[in-house]
Structure formats: C-alpha cells, structure tokens
C-alpha cells in the first residue's frame, strides 16, 4: 500500500524533499500556510554551499537551472568600520561557480516549485495540530478546521514548528534582534548606494551592532540591522528615526542606507534551539530545517535545510517499505552533522555582535587556509 507522506511547510527544505521524492516516483503533499507562492516577500539572497545546498539541488536534478539563476558576482563582500574605512574586500573570480554563488530566495523557491506537479502544494493550509490515529499515522488539523490524514508527517514548518512538539519540548532562546528594510531601484534612484554595496554584500561593523546591505537580482537592496538581544519592545525599532539614533556618529554615507529605505522597518527576534538538541525517534514523524535545528542566521540555515531534505528523501526512497527505519537513519546522521555547525553558528553570531567584532571578523575572513594533510 502506498505510504501517504505529508510535508508541513513549503520552504526550501520541504520543497527540496518533495522534489527528490517526486524524482523517485513518491508523491507527497506539501501543506503551506501562505495563500500562494507570491503572497509575501521571501527575503534576501543566500549563498548555496557546494557540500550542502548545491549538493541537494544536484540530487533534485536542478543544478543546471540553479546555474542559470545564480549570480557568482554576488559572492563579493565588503566589510567596513563605522567611519567607512574598508577592512576587507573580497572579489570572486568573474563567472566562477567554484565557490558559493548567490541566488535570491524567491528565485530558488520558484525553481523548486516549478519542478513539482501543480497539485503538490496545498496553499492556505496552516497546520495547527497533529494527533496520532489509532491505526497509525496522523490526523492533521488546519487553521480553518479542515482535516486530513497521513502515514508519515515531516515537519518543515520553520522556527515556530507545530510538528516539533510531537518530538521534543525544547524551548527557543532569544539571541539577537534583526531589523529589515528595503531600498528599491537602487541603480537609478540611489547610485551612490549601489556603488557602496556593489554586486554582493556589505557589512558595516560597529560595537555590538551591524548595518548590512545585500544586492538582490531585481535591482533592490535588502538592508539589515543586527543588534544584541535586549529587553526592549520590537515596536521601538519600527521608525527610521529611532534606527538612525542607534548609529549616531557613523559616516552619513553608511546611514544613508537607512534613510533611503521605503516603508516602515520590520523588526523581528532571532531565536535559536539549544546546541545538541536530539529526540527519541517516533514512528511516522520527523523534522527538517529550522524545525529540527534552528540556528542563528549566519549562512547555514537554508543550506542545511535543503541537505536535510535531500538526505531524508534518499533514505525514504531507498527503503519505501519501512519509512520508520529510514527516519531513524536520517535522524542519527543529521544530529551528528548539525552539532558542529550549530556550535560554529553560535560562535559567529556572538563574534559579529561583540565589542571587538571588527577585529574578530577581519581575522576570520583573512585567516590562512589550513594546509592539506599528508596521508
């Protein structure tokens, strides 16, 4: 009998999982809370790592399409101090795909969505509860009262995962505050900012705070302000005036990134799960991505979510008659893989928002490569 697989969450990890299972002839349903693929902005760009995100896309048969959408020049990054002095300027080799080329999250999500049958994603389905059925499997309840059932439930439902509670009662920790803004049509309307940021990423590093900007493929800039965790209401970050006050004394060329932004700033808490989080495997359910291992956003989250999806899909496809065994194998490997990555992410997050962040980040980006070991 066919195993009915439900994926809660249509982010990059859930869609990667669905795509690879589809390639193996295994159908799934992805339940997503959004009204459509274009219901809300998908955030900025990300760099896909060869050993994780790019590997997952290769397993999905989408490496060629990724190359057509990615921007190798988006790897360029500049690190400045509050005076505007350049501390680090990295320029990738022109046209090279040997590193970690950038791609807009929206473009990557569309690439995955376009690779799936049209009825794979059930939009407007926000999961609110999953209860075990007497004969095995799960009954799923959605926000509007609709219900359905499945044999295997995979939680790809992000930081505030509903599925996570079926496996662990772990609590999230508040580690930082992020405020996001957007600057539209930067080349035409703000050429000085276009030159400042370049084709990739800019980080302006101060004491316990960072002002960053990222070029997107649509000609806009995504501006992000990272601050240490504080006992301060999010509403206090919703005006540009309040944000400019945080950067008093900085070079006006840098704070122009805030002044040029359209619309109100969007603040949010950055949270993380405890490093080393594990759970006892439970039949018919598991987690991938942020639902499984929420980490500070330092470049690993989406990559590891996609690799989770690829590895879980591979185990399910290799053992279709025993999904519980496939889940156990996936989980043990995932726990071991994620632990050092979560430790690294926490260290980098702390380094970036420290009193000595500028010196530490320069040292991090300019450290010599480790010599190859001789066998």
Kindly give the residue locations of the regions a language model identified.
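FAD/FMN-dependent oxidoreductases across multiple families
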Residues: 195, 199, 206-209, 215-221, ...
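Short, surface-exposed charged micro-motifs
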Residues: 129, 212-213
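Conserved N-terminal helical subregion
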Residues: 1-5, 20, 47-167, 171-186, ...
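Short amphipathic alpha-helical segments
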Residues: 19, 42, 165-168, 299-300, ...
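A short acidic, helix-capping loop that chelates divalent metal ions and anchors anionic groups
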Residues: 37-41, 97-98, 232-233, 297
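Alpha-helical, largely C-terminal catalytic domains
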Residues: 247, 337-375
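Conserved mid-domain beta->alpha element of the FAD-binding
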Residues: 6-35, 154-155, 159, 245, ...
């Amino acid at each position: 009998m066919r195993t009915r697989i439900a994926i809660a969450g249509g982010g990059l990890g859930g869609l990667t999982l669905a795509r690879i299972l589809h390639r193996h002839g295994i159908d799934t349903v992805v339940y997503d809370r959004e009204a459509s693929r274009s219901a809300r902005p998908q955030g900025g760009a990300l760099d896909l790592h060869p050993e994780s995100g790019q590997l997952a896309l290769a397993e999905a048969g989408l490496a060629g399409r990724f190359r057509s959408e990615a921007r190798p020049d988006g790897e360029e990054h500049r690190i400045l101090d509050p005076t505007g002095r350049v501390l680090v300027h990295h320029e990738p080799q022109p046209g090279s795909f040997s590193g970690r080329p950038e791609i807009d999250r929206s473009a990557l999500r569309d690439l995955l969505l376009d690779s799936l049958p049209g009825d794979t994603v059930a939009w407007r389905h926000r999961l609110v509860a999953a209860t075990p059925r007497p004969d095995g499997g799960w009954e799923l309840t959605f926000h509007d009262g609709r219900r359905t059932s499945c044999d295997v439930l995979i939680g790809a439902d992000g930081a505030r995962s509903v599925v996570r509670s079926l496996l662990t009662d772990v609590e999230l920790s508040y580690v930082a505050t992020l405020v996001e803004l957007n600057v539209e049509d930067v080349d035409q309307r703000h050429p000085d900012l276009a030159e400042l940021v370049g084709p990739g990423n800019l980080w302006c590093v101060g004491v316990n705070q960072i002002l960053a900007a990222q070029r997107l493929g649509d000609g806009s800039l995504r501006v992000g302000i990272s601050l240490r965790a504080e006992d301060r209401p999010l509403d206090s970050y919703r005006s540009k005036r309040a944000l400019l006050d945080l950067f008093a004394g900085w070079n006006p060329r840098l704070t122009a990134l805030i002044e040029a932004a359209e619309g109100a700033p969007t603040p949010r808490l950055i949270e993380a799960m405890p490093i080393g989080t594990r759970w006892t495997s439970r039949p018919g359910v598991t987690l991938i991505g942020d639902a499984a291992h929420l980490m500070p956003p330092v470049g690993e989250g989406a990559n590891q979510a996609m690799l989770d999806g690829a590895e879980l899909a591979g185990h399910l496809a290799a053992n279709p008659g025993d999904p519980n065994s496939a889940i156990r194998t996936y989980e043990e490997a995932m726990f071991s893989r994620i632990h050092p990555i979560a430790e690294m992410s926490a260290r980098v997050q702390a380094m970036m928002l420290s009193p000595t962040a500028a010196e530490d980040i320069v040292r991090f980006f300019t450290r010599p490569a480790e010599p190859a070991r001789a066998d």
